[in-house]
């Protein structure tokens, strides 16, 4: 163990020697930069950009660029970065994490790598934990960047898409971690390229990186919308409709357990829902409801595929074991359709439209770096998950803070009495005190006790970032007493007031140990900034959460041996510190394992999300005919339909293929079983494909120009992809909950999730291509379709399920009722645009 520790220390020292060598080179330019006029110094930015364009790397530009920023900061802000800050800046540029103590000037340190990377012109994102810090840092440090000719933007949640786009197009963009993540998700939900706000993700520099990438790693960002009561009504209406059908109105393919409406069923659907054409692009959502209602009523069997529990819940039956599968729901809306069929309550759920974890969000940047004062304890996680090293940077001045040994009390009450007594004693002499708690409830409890003791104080609990920053700035003044939860005021320095140094500086009192050593170190680090004097003291009790869960038995036994069980007994021992640290390491290990598992699950979705988003972005940005892509989908859909019956009885197979072709591909009278008999599967595929191509060309000929064709193709694909992807995310969530239970059966849930998730993804791709094919082949296209569909696609979900076609029958030529409708739908005039005339 000692050898490993020695090796780590030597590696750190070697890294620091390299950094110091580069830092000295930066410092060697100081006199040269100081001699330049403001105009010449500002002109360096354009010079660097030109040199970069000609082939110089950012690493080659680093010494001069850092020197320019140092001189600019001195002229604009009156601040001149120290050598240790230069070293920290180099670490950031390398895509690592410099561990810099509180008060060592991390914000100023960041200006150098931010400026250097902005020269590339691909955008730099400076990420903070709240909007107060984004606004503050962008305003203060933005003066330096603006002076040097770079543009600076602030991305706030309240900004409009146009304002966000402007902020992201700046050389440097300040934003919170959550807003960057949500903007990424929203960008992958729009249907027009001009509605996107972000550029490709280039370089992110994350302030308080441990908070963002470690503490919040388990919480995914989710864009969701509540499923409306109107949606539930559509499940019920679709169910009522399919219950009116007879066996001639639908066709079941037994081997594949699929079902579709026959021509008579389509006619009934159009009549029931008052539509001119069921397969118009505007009715994609409705056809989805009808498909599910058909499956629920005529494919899914009560007491075989599912059961209804006594409390009215639909439970899936495992086909292999015959047992019900608790917690599982059929995906893609089928479960709700069965609930409608059985007349039980349709469970309203918020539907996730998009989600991502911070882990996978920030791993998408070409380069990622971060700053914090406390990260060394999480070094393994940073290295394994983010490929980032933790480089401890020496302080500019030696640390003068005194860290006292922990004090342990038998009960919470005796501990809090001791805390109040300590505060009272220190307050009497004017020493400022920061009392740190792990929960808002504890803050309120301490506050009440201080009120009873007559001690004036401020309470912070991370609710108002702007107000708390002002309070925390004054926490170092003589006589100040401040109570704060762990994260409150983080990012704001506590500067000592006049005469406070002589009183011992700021005293930090911890009311219990946090699960993470890193959080405790952050609290300690609020005191003793830049060589200031200070103190820290932690108060513990056997009733603290950490002590109850880990290690308290040994300490209790120690107390029993010492016969120190009185209420106000206190113990102070090195053994106590070792026990607490051991408990914290165990909790940290458990939390790391949890975060690692979250990442393993999200990696499955990440791969699928990247495929969907990349294809989606390709569609949005395309200025070309998407015909080749759609034709490929049609070809694969036909191939799947034919292959699904390869092992069936030949007559049954031909009948099923004809049914597929008639319901999803071509007009009913244009294909028959007779012409397909005697053909091999490959010949059938080719014949159906050529027929489909003819229909495809016929469909697009109804649009006036190439622009209209491209717009129609885009909307067709995007509406179906978004609908299926949303359903797929929901299905993956349900799968994840279900496979977690399988861990009890000695199965690896992550492996099962990966295998089943991949199969579900393949099924979703097939469903997308089938819906695109069916809608393309069966949609009644007219010129107004383009505008209507485009407008609809900009909303979160298609709403106009019951809208009618606006074609005017007066404009059509005189047609007999049983003749083909001139609109090109392939239907009889009486069942299409002639319906109103003959009703």
UniProtKB/Swiss-Prot annotation:
Residues that, per the record, bind ATP: 85, 103-107, 493
Disordered: annotated segments: 780-839
Membrane topology type: Peripheral membrane protein
Pfam families xref list: P-loop_SecA (PF21090), SEC-C (PF02810), SecA_DEAD (PF07517), SecA_PP_bind (PF01043), SecA_SW (PF07516)
Stored PROSITE patterns: SECA, SECA_MOTOR_DEAD
Cellular component annotations (GO), alphabetically ordered: cell envelope Sec protein transport complex; cytosol; plasma membrane
Cofactor: Zn(2+)
Top-level EC class: translocase
Biased composition (Basic residues): 827-839
Known partners and oligomeric status: Monomer and homodimer. Part of the essential Sec protein translocation apparatus which comprises SecA, SecYEG and auxiliary proteins SecDF. Other proteins may also be involved.
Protein's name according to its UniProt entry: Protein translocase subunit SecA
Organism, scientific name: Streptococcus pyogenes serotype M49 (strain NZ131)
